[in-house]
Amino acid sequence: MKIGILALQGAFAEHAQMLEKLGIESVELRNLKNFQQHYSDLSGLILPGGESTAIGKLLRELYMLEPIKQAISSGFPVFGTCAGLILLAKEITSQKESHFGTMDIVVERNAYGRQLGSFYTEADCKGVGKIPMTFIRGPIISSVGKKVNILATVNNKIVAAQEKNMLVTSFHPELTNNLSLHKYFIDICKVA
């Protein structure tokens, strides 16, 4: 099994380290040719945290947005953390247009405020158990469609969800030593 990691910005190296600990090979995807070259060998894709507006702009400039969107729309498993969650959202409250727009969620960017508003907590996550959660100016999911399964909440705010083969978190599981969510994603990839 091999997992692609969008490597335009953000914590892509940390996701690769998590996968390595699980014995899973990964490949960094930096441009369209790179994505096309590896796509048929991939079992899934991770969209890491970072700055969603910058990543969205790069995806468009590198002509990667539509091919990746088509793959996700056809059932290709994807795990979006923080900015990756925003990229997948059907609607972003502070923006006119979405990026991939494949997941039936409405997202509020930077809901957890500035860098100083970042925090760490632990909470239960369906299918995984109690896990550590590191929030860095994280978004929140303000509403979900009928087919979206809410996996975790913190202070009554949705911070993890799944719709079919799309898994998202507002927090950064790659910045902890807990492999549970990455294992959960690998299980999604195995049955996809």
Curated annotation (Swiss-Prot):
GO terms for biological process: glutamine catabolic process; pyridoxal phosphate biosynthetic process; pyridoxine metabolic process. The keyword Lyase applies. It comes from the Bacteria. The keyword Cell membrane does not apply. GO terms for cellular component: cytosol; glutaminase complex. Pfam families: SNO. Keywords: Glutamine amidotransferase, Hydrolase, Lyase, Pyridoxal phosphate. The active site is at 82 (nucleophile), 172 (charge relay system), 174 (charge relay system). One of its GO terms (molecular function) is glutaminase activity. Its EC number is 4.3.3.6, 3.5.1.2. Pathway: Cofactor biosynthesis; pyridoxal 5'-phosphate biosynthesis. L-glutamine binds at residues 50-52, 109, 136-137. It catalyses: aldehydo-D-ribose 5-phosphate + D-glyceraldehyde 3-phosphate + L-glutamine = pyridoxal 5'-phosphate + L-glutamate + phosphate + 3 H2O + H(+); L-glutamine + H2O = L-glutamate + NH4(+). In the presence of PdxS, forms a dodecamer of heterodimers. Only shows activity in the heterodimer. Belongs to the glutaminase PdxT/SNO family. PANTHER family: PYRIDOXAL 5'-PHOSPHATE SYNTHASE SUBUNIT SNO (PTHR31559), PYRIDOXAL 5'-PHOSPHATE SYNTHASE SUBUNIT SNO1-RELATED (PTHR31559:SF0). Catalyzes the hydrolysis of glutamine to glutamate and ammonia as part of the biosynthesis of pyridoxal 5'-phosphate. The resulting ammonia molecule is channeled to the active site of PdxS. This is Pyridoxal 5'-phosphate synthase subunit PdxT.
